[in-house]
């Protein structure tokens, strides 16, 4: 059995209760209904409407200098050069459309390939499977020829460089031989001049 509490203990227990503030909206249904019927009050706008004098002044300016264009440009659209930026020497930033490839006028192979591949989008609606496969084969063949030509150009360039290096080396070798020969001749002349005795008659 629990021990009996004294009157003072009971009183202190009741007095030390924490008070809670409960809103009427939660407890009172009438208050809740009143709140729901209230219109939504929007805060006053901070932007003031211009005065008549200010409007007149603005219109006078427009008449004098013309209206400003409403379009506002960002910094990246204005193409302003960036300051305090480290510029790497010898590297030029590419401008314009990326992936632009120019074809030479006399390059019939590439032109044919491009024409055939461009028509691919528009011709597929009214062509049979056989025609399509034939055309795709043609495009593949043209691409293969282009690759072969590129490889050939690479090989030719490499061969040209090799020949250039070889010719430079042979030229240097020939120069070295010439200089060595001329040096030997000079030495032999000097030695023969030393061995001869000159006699002068008075």
UniProtKB/Swiss-Prot annotation:
Protein species of origin: Debaryomyces hansenii (strain ATCC 36239 / CBS 767 / BCRC 21394 / JCM 1990 / NBRC 0083 / IGC 2968)
Name listed for the protein in its UniProt record: 60S ribosomal subunit assembly/export protein LOC1
Classification via PANTHER family: 60S RIBOSOMAL SUBUNIT ASSEMBLY/EXPORT PROTEIN LOC1, 60S RIBOSOMAL SUBUNIT ASSEMBLY_EXPORT PROTEIN LOC1
Quaternary structure and partners: Component of the 66S pre-ribosomal particle.
Region called Disordered, residue ranges: 1-43, 145-202
Coiled coil feature spans: 111-176
Record localization: Nucleus, Nucleolus
Cross-referenced InterPro entries: Loc1 (IPR037650)
Function: Required for efficient assembly and nuclear export of the 60S ribosomal subunit.
